[in-house]
């Protein structure tokens, strides 16, 4: 729905009687009508009706820009209705180092927990996708930039071990700035712990699909995010270890290549397997999961590329 269409529809539904109101009252009423109803795309500046954007899973209908979505929204988009069974909901971070930066770590945790209604930066559990049982983990960037502390690492590890034990495929969505500095070495050790659990999952012959979303950096990239048997990414996702500004300042050799660290750049250079738009992700994941279930292979539709690769960028 365009802006002009919305105003035309609004005029049909109701008429605002502003006669006799002061200019301040008129401004307040117009602002109350407009606030939250429209979102401006940071990529193309197009205004999109918020409900239309939500129905399109936060993907700009004008240019395809992928806005960030929350972990609960991701689960709602992907899993069969009513199939989600959360795991390890009781796990919550502590402050063993009594860390203090601009404010105490414990106070910072409480603030993010209240703001996001999450205990930490990942949701893990079991569900089904097009009837196929799956173990799934989804990171939420709203919680301290999706940073990986001891709870995130523990939940990812337990999820992986559960998938290995129950012979389930594993799908993890990454969105993170890296390891959580407030937990020091306890955070860094999660890289080795999650990687070891995934190695056991692989040795058991089970599938792991890693989906990279914007942004995925640091210790998450250096551990489980890049260990998938299949590595997918959303269009435009920024993925790396250190950020481009840090790299430029460190190497001191001018500008980095255009598009460096984007999903498109990684695909062109063989670091990921496919770029899948969010609106097609459920269908594509279902196809990939079914390919690893022999009884379902015969009924699969043809698997076609979902994202064109520009040969000039290779």
Swiss-Prot record:
Entry annotated with the keyword GTP-binding: no
Gene3D superfamilies: 2-enoyl-CoA Hydratase, Chain A, domain 1
Annotated pathway: Lipid metabolism; malonyl-CoA biosynthesis; malonyl-CoA from acetyl-CoA: step 1/1
Keywords from the named record: ATP-binding, Cytoplasm, Fatty acid biosynthesis, Fatty acid metabolism, Lipid biosynthesis, Lipid metabolism, Metal-binding, Nucleotide-binding, Transferase, Zinc, Zinc-finger
Matching Pfam families: Carboxyl_trans, Zn_ribbon_ACC
Residues at which Zn(2+) binds: 41, 44, 60, 63
Enzyme Commission (EC) number: 2.1.3.15
One function term, GO molecular function aspect: carboxyl- or carbamoyltransferase activity
Cofactor binding comment, as recorded: Binds 1 zinc ion per subunit.
Cofactor: Zn(2+)
Gene Ontology CC entries for this record: acetyl-CoA carboxylase complex
Enzyme class: transferase
Catalysed reaction equations from the record: N(6)-carboxybiotinyl-L-lysyl-[protein] + acetyl-CoA = N(6)-biotinyl-L-lysyl-[protein] + malonyl-CoA
Zn finger limits (C4-type): 41-63
Residue intervals of the CoA carboxyltransferase N-terminal domain: 37-307
Record GO biological process: fatty acid biosynthetic process; malonyl-CoA biosynthetic process
Protein location: Cytoplasm
Keyword Magnesium: no
NCBIfam families: accD
Function recorded in the entry: Component of the acetyl coenzyme A carboxylase (ACC) complex. Biotin carboxylase (BC) catalyzes the carboxylation of biotin on its carrier protein (BCCP) and then the CO(2) group is transferred by the transcarboxylase to acetyl-CoA to form malonyl-CoA.
Family (UniProt): Belongs to the AccD/PCCB family.
Quaternary organization: Acetyl-CoA carboxylase is a heterohexamer composed of biotin carboxyl carrier protein (AccB), biotin carboxylase (AccC) and two subunits each of ACCase subunit alpha (AccA) and ACCase subunit beta (AccD).
Protein name per Swiss-Prot or TrEMBL: Acetyl-coenzyme A carboxylase carboxyl transferase subunit beta
Chain's gene name: accD
